[in-house]
């Protein structure tokens, strides 16, 4: 046998004796970025890193420190990027993605949504809308959202579970952390819905009991699916006693329905939410419906009285503020007073119709401008508080403070990367101000939910984007055709050359 040369033998012995890598193995290491943790100390780490194993964060710290502790199956170079918790949207509407701008400069928006959601939509409509708005959220770094299964004046598509099933199946594939709010629509009952089979329409009269039963079916099928990533919430229409006074049997019936819906939320341990609160409706919800509490989220809640702010604070009820919504223009949202009373307030988009977006950076900026203008004071709503309202405060409002909202060991790996080297984001110092004042959703490069990459380097990973937009266009066209709303696609009189619409 041929002898091994001494030099080669020495190399082989050296390699063979090398100590094994003692570093812990993780699935993903994001390193080299500016890490905005939103933890209790609100740490910002220059050249920071986040280590992920499975669905959870295992460590956050300086890149050099985590490099020494962990070896990763996959590493993301976050140089010249901001690494932060995924954004959270507390109020939206399923369906709105396919009715954008429809009737917005007239009084036709609510009737149009009622017609389409109740009588012009199909399973394919709801599925296509979920894929479309799911893709939009992923692109904008919105990792957690709550949406009602319908909209307008509480037109809920809960006449049959198949619509909610289709919606949640799509969201399951997209990969978002998602809460679907279901429940009855506004009375009286029965309400007329239409089921479409091909080109054939079948009218269906739907009762309150039927809608509540469909809601419970969806809860049993979907709540806490995929390791808790998909959840259900219960919703009930907000009653405005000043606008629609009720007495006698009509009031008794409404109260019974509200309490039955609230009881279902408690039975299943669900968040309970209401849309469209304004002056006096919060007091009614507390004193007549008796439905408020720490697991309740009230949306809009504009024009609240001092007494109502005290009620919300006393009951521990949470509030979602939609600064870009039309409702916020009709009455002031009393954010400063609510925060000073100790109420948890988060931000919401109010969906994307008729004139909005799921870009939560846009709503952060809008919230600051809205309240500073209202108070004529540029010190109102500091940028840091606005960022908290789409991260840590938002997580608390949804009852998820132990799971999401900040980058900390043990929390779910809901993480986004924001390009900090684009012209409008430069110079790169003061990253917190860049996020609050200059960033927009299109600056997000990478979105991670539950430890899974949903978008990397601006490329969606879980859906075919071209197919998503093509399906959305087709279903929007079909819904408008079924309901005969083609005229609403035209530019209205008064669009050009006037100081206000007629």
Residue ranges and their predicted role:
Residues 291, 336-425, 438-440:
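His/Asp/Glu-enriched, well-ordered alpha-helical/loop segment
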Residues 12-48, 52-63, 391-502:
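Active-site microenvironment of metallo-dependent hydrolases
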